[in-house]
């Protein structure tokens, strides 16, 4: 049950767990706003109602409302305002899940009388409770749909026109941008502080209602050569876990033109959406200069790193056990004379840089691990030999290593980052925070791109 939007309430709840570490094969996604659009479609996917759907009076409406019953249960069994939570009130991430339906609620209430809403939190105030109950009794009327602000409308037109320019160079650029910004909360310069947009692929052109094309991954085929990049006003409440802000402005568009459109290179054909190509950014976007791609990532390295820290992959201790409680991150200088900054080296290594998402979503750990371990070892050994055989000698490389570290061009605060682990979550902040950590990451272009395609895009 997703309570961050009205559409989540009307969709209802499902007993199928989104995160299930024992599942060995993929299941159809059920992303709100994407994988179904109507209540009937969600019911066909196994979601049951939490609001009344066939009531004719306020009394019947409340009686049929699972949401009301859960709120009422809390009123009947108020939570103490002081002291520790009882052992029966489990708040751990991996707790046993209970997802009752309206038909099963009486049994649920008998077995778990203290599990009303809000779960494990103090009771709502009388005013809050009364407001919600009155709204539910009225049939939970639909709130006014948000609309783009006046300050955003002109920018929306310009940005959608930019993203859908017809040249092959622009089409390749827009695909690259989309695959890196698809989970961003886009904020336009000069618009209200809580007005955000998502970049989506739509079957409808600018000026028409958006019909998002639902694919599992952003590099999956849109199903047609005729599709459009659109900016969709995000209607849900903002929550810290998934809130990754990325700003669009005139300066940003000028920077995109500087990086991707003004350099002298040719795009002779667009890359295939076949998974062997699309899942490997070093093949799909090889026509775009490496410097342009890497500079784009470095411009907002905080956002790129935050993509996997705040994305759906980073959840729970299993995901977080691989990182230290606090560590620093720096990046290889895009102007340094190292192989990872050169097209020839990346073309040579592209087969060794492919990612497991090429193999699909069904778990085959041993076979995949062996294959990619061999590829990774080959790449690491080749990269090491290439570094040592470059113009600088090994002695200078180790003695003067800091000259290979990006300094943010003297002004970019993304040059140094600190990552904190908080038990089963994490966060990113700019700069070196705290004393010297036990470890630090030095990330070059291939590693930064692979982190994104392994843990975010793929």
Residues covered by each model-derived region:
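Aromatic- and Gly/Pro-enriched helix-to-coil junctions and flexible linker segments
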Residues: 1-458
């Amino acid at each position: 049950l997703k309570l961050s939007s009205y559409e989540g309430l009307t969709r209802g709840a499902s007993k199928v767990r989104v995160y299930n570490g024992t599942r060995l094969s993929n299941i159809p996604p059920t992303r709100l706003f994407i994988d179904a659009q109507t209540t009937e479609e969600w019911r066909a996917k196994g979601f049951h109602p939490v609001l009344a759907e066939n009531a004719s009076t306020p009394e019947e409406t409340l009686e049929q409302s699972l949401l009301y019953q859960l709120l009422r249960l809390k009123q009947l069994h108020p939570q103490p305002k002081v002291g520790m939570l009882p052992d029966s009130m489990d708040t751990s991430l991996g707790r046993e899940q209970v997802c009752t339906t309206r038909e099963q609620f009486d049994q649920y209430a008998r077995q778990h009388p203290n599990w009303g809403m809000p779960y494990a939190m103090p009771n709502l105030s009388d005013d809050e409770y009364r407001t919600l109950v009155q709204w539910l009794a009225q049939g939970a009327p639909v709130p006014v749909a948000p609309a783009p602000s006046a300050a955003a409308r002109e920018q929306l037109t310009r940005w959608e026109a930019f993203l859908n320019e017809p040249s092959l160079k622009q089409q390749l650029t827009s695909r690259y941008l989309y695959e890196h910004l698809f989970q961003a909360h886009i904020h336009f310069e000069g618009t209200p502080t809580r007005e955000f947009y998502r970049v989506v692929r739509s079957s409808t052109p600018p000026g028409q209602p958006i019909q998002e094309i639902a694919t599992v991954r952003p590099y999956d085929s849109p199903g047609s050569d005729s599709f459009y990049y659109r900016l969709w006003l995000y209607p849900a409440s903002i929550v810290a876990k998934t809130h990754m802000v990325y700003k669009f402005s005139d300066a940003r568009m000028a920077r995109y033109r500087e990086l991707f459109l003004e350099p002298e290179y040719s795009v002779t054909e667009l890359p295939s959406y076949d998974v062997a190509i699309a899942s490997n950014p070093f093949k799909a976007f090889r026509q775009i200069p490496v410097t342009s791609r890497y500079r784009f990532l470095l411009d907002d390295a905080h956002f790129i790193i935050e993509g996997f820290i705040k994305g759906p992959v980073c959840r729970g201790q299993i995901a977080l056990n691989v990182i230290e409680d606090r560590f620093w991150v720096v990046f290889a200088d895009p102007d340094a004379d190292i192989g990872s900054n050169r097209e020839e080296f990346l073309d040579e290594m592209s087969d060794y840089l492919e990612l497991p998402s090429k193999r699909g979503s069904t778990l085959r750990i041993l076979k995949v691990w062996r294959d990619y371990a061999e590829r990774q070892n080959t790449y690491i050994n080749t990269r090491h030999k290439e570094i040592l055989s470059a113009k600088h000698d090994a002695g200078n490389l180790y003695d003067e290593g800091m000259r290979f570290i990006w300094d943010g061009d003297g002004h970019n605060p993304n040059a140094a980052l600190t990552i904190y682990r908080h038990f089963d979550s994490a966060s990113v902040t700019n700069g070196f925070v705290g004393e010297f950590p036990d470890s630090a990451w030095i990330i070059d272009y291939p590693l930064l791109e692979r982190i994104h395609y392994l843990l975010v895009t793929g």
